[in-house]
Amino acid sequence: MILLAVLFLCFFSSYSASVKGHTTGLSLNNERLYKLTYSTEVFLDGGKGKLQDSVGYRISSDVDVVLLWRNPDGDDDQLIQVTITAVNVENAGQQRGEKSIFKGKSTPKIVGKDNLEALRRPMLLHLVRGKVKEFYSYENEPVGIENLKRGLASLFQMQLTSGTTNEVDISGDCKVTYQAQQDKVVKIKALDTCKIERSGFTTANQVLGVTSKATSVTTYKIEDSFVTAVVAEETRAFALNFLQTVAGKIVSKQKLELKTTEAGPRMVPGKQVAGVIKAIDSKYKAIPIVGQVLQSVCKGCPSLAEHWQSIRKHLEPENLSNAEAVQSFLAFIQHLRTSRREEILQILKAEKKEVLPQLVDAVTSAQTPASLEAILDFLDFKSDSSIILQERFLYACGFASHPDEELLQALLSKFKGSFASNDIRESVMIIIGALVRKLCQNEGCKLKAVVEAKKLILGGLEKPEKKEDTTMYLLALKNALLPEGIPLLLKYAEAGEGPVSHLATTVLQRYDASFITDEVKKTLNRIYHQNRKVHEKTVRTTAAAVILKNNPSYMDVKNILLSIGELPKEMNKYMLTIVQDILHFEMPASKMIRRVLKEMIVHNYDRFSKSGSSSAYTGYVERSPHAASTYSLDILYSGSGILRRSNLNIFQYIGKAELHGSQVVIEAQGLEGLIAATPDEGEENLDSYAGMSAILFDVQLRPVTFFNGYSDLMSKMLSASGDPVSVVKGLILLIDHSQDIQLQSGLKANMDIQGGLAIDISGSMEFSLWYRESKTRVKNRVAVVITSDITVDSSFVKAGLESRAETEAGLEFISTVQFSQYPFLVCMQMDKAEAPLRQFETKYERLSTGRGYVSRRRKESLVPGCELPLHQENSEMCNVVFPPQPESGNSGGGWF
């Protein structure tokens, strides 16, 4: 017991009458050599795996500790020397047998001669009141080796009393809590408070983000009032919010235990620690105890050009619907992030036009200074020969996972220049709005470029230089969602012309409920009830939708319900189905609507039996205890049976977080003249127009036009091929999480999760006067790949866990209208194609010399396709529009 007691002796020293205080942390006796054993081990698995299924490794050694100096004025100030000896590297808990990467390998072969020599060099710790004041080592030692030493040194830092304080150790400047008990002291480190410089980023939207949990507990065991051993465990776990099967866990353990003591060297005399260290060895230098960045070197990896050539075929247009295209896209982004501007630019200039759009997607998505410089050097916005590339660049900017001020500043500079295409100019401003919102979400609202962009958007709406620019600035505000823009939106919504008024109300529709105040709802009520001027149906119905979505009052709901029956025919039916959908789907406003419906004047048969074909419906695509995916479809027709607006939305919810996955709106107006019909009130003088607008992953894109004006309509009808118009097509980096983690053992961990998709959203509108039928189609096709890569690296041995999930899916919406009679026949169909789901997992252990162990697993399933249900009236109507075909076979009544 005496031998154990002298380790980290926690006692009132009796060897010197000059001691003025007592130890508050670990203390050693003089002229003793402490022989300890030390081990650090790490395990990686998929989050719920068993220990034997994990990968990892164990580094063990002997440790010699001696007290070199103690301050004559107090025993709480001491200098100790720590020397690592007898290093061994092996598997951590797993029995690999012949498959072990360490079998037959000596420690010098595994660790490396230079690394091992550096690891064995003694380090010095200056302890003051139990905390490491300075960490001394030799200059120019390998970073990975220094970090292993720091991991051991941090265990010597403790206090004997309970309390919360801040400590600096290998993890950084962290908040720690001590819990002192009779037989142990427990130190809990709050890893989320640690301040340490490490690269990393994540996606702002929580639906696409990563939930992580980190814990660190160090236990100092005490026997008979003396510390005898130190046991530490750190856990890092993560899961992708959107797909929780993409998960991982790192467990890092340390153990330091006394074995024996023997006679040691005399203490070095001196009053100042600096002089003592110089006397011991002048080559010692004070270095930070905080872990330093270990740069991973890729040996034998292909160059950027070689990598591009190996994946190029997967990114050809005809292959983009395959998951392999997205996998190649994600891997190439990782390579681009470590590449120089010149390398990137060289590939851009050498590529052919068929694959260039996909290359532009990847380069822009890399989001590094080098990739931004390269793409801006490559694109010429004054040339009309690269319009497609310019638009792909802008869309990739809009979807940027972690944009910075430099990207926004670059687009602001471009906007001030000249353009070969006005469409591109509009897209630049719209995407500026998207970047403003993302930067503000990341606490960047006061950045110089953001302030400039906000001023540009709001100024453009207050005093537009050109009337046609109003739409552009409204679309930018629809992305930026600036609270200070709401008064301008109300002005345009109430006093603007039809299309501008409608756009302004749709912008208000995207704001959070906290911004839709009573004043805002007063204006929207005036618009809906037409108190000051006549508005188009699209404007009025959108105003009503905003009111009903944002905590409507009793009178708000009552007045809207009382209006049903007094509206134009199709608007009556539309508003009725909106109310029914709120009740059916139990939306927040449903409670207030049920209260109002208790009044007989509101709830009567005449009001709720209005006929028509307009409709609204919301349903679930997927639903689980922690997440839900919903679709909603609302269609508004004119009184003559021609489509006025169709609106298809998909939302993803995780907890309270929300992602507007997609919205495709097809609008048409001024087409009544084609069938000699009478326009509805307020829509007598509308120009013929049809177009499509899309929101994708919370980003409003530039709308596209099918036709504009009667002459354009007739030429399109005469030359129509029925081919769909593409709204957005390309490769998108959707999930992007990267984290460098300094484990307290000294090992370096990396966590990279990426999700990408190849997407093609197209729409078409067919119109036949001969058959008196119109048909609209919206087609969504996607290939999705999510990858995660976790590694733990010591510089000479690495363990890793790679996982991948992939699928190809499709969703098609078709609306068929036969207007040869009234009420006209409408059939809506939403078809979800079958989707294969493939999951892969690879675990590995690898030496820096190249020898490795690999374990692979895969799982496949097929999610069946289906037709998503809409309301019962629609099903009955579809049976009329597309009557069941009689069974084939001889009827017996034919001529032959």
Swiss-Prot record:
The gene is Mttp. This is Microsomal triglyceride transfer protein large subunit. Residues 1-21 form the signal peptide. Keywords: Disulfide bond, Endoplasmic reticulum, Golgi apparatus, Lipid transport, Lipid-binding, Signal, Transport. It comes from the Eukaryota. It catalyses: a 1,2-diacyl-sn-glycero-3-phosphocholine(in) = a 1,2-diacyl-sn-glycero-3-phosphocholine(out); a 1,2-diacyl-sn-glycero-3-phosphoethanolamine(in) = a 1,2-diacyl-sn-glycero-3-phosphoethanolamine(out); a cholesterol ester(in) = a cholesterol ester(out); a triacyl-sn-glycerol(in) = a triacyl-sn-glycerol(out). GO terms for molecular function: apolipoprotein binding; ceramide 1-phosphate transfer activity; cholesterol transfer activity; lipid binding; lipid transporter activity; phosphatidylcholine transfer activity; phosphatidylethanolamine transfer activity; phospholipid transfer activity. SUPFAM superfamilies: Lipovitellin-phosvitin complex, beta-sheet shell regions, Lipovitellin-phosvitin complex, superhelical domain. Residues 28-659 form the Vitellogenin domain. Disulfide bonds join C174-C194. It is found in: Endoplasmic reticulum; Golgi apparatus. GO terms for biological process: cholesterol homeostasis; circadian rhythm; establishment of localization in cell; lipid metabolic process; lipid transport; lipoprotein metabolic process; lipoprotein transport; low-density lipoprotein particle remodeling. The keyword Transmembrane does not apply. InterPro entries: Lipid_transp_b-sht_shell, Lipovitellin_superhlx_dom, MTP_lip-bd, MTTP, Vitellinogen_b-sht_N, Vitellogenin_N. Catalyzes the transport of triglyceride, cholesteryl ester, and phospholipid between phospholipid surfaces. Required for the assembly and secretion of plasma lipoproteins that contain apolipoprotein B. May be involved in regulating cholesteryl ester biosynthesis in cells that produce lipoproteins. The keyword Signal applies. One of its GO terms (cellular component) is Golgi apparatus. Heterodimer; heterodimerizes with the protein disulfide isomerase (P4HB/PDI). Interacts with APOB. Interacts with PRAP1. Gene3D superfamilies: Lipovitellin, beta-sheet shell regions, chain A (2.30.230.10), Vitellinogen, superhelical (1.25.10.20).
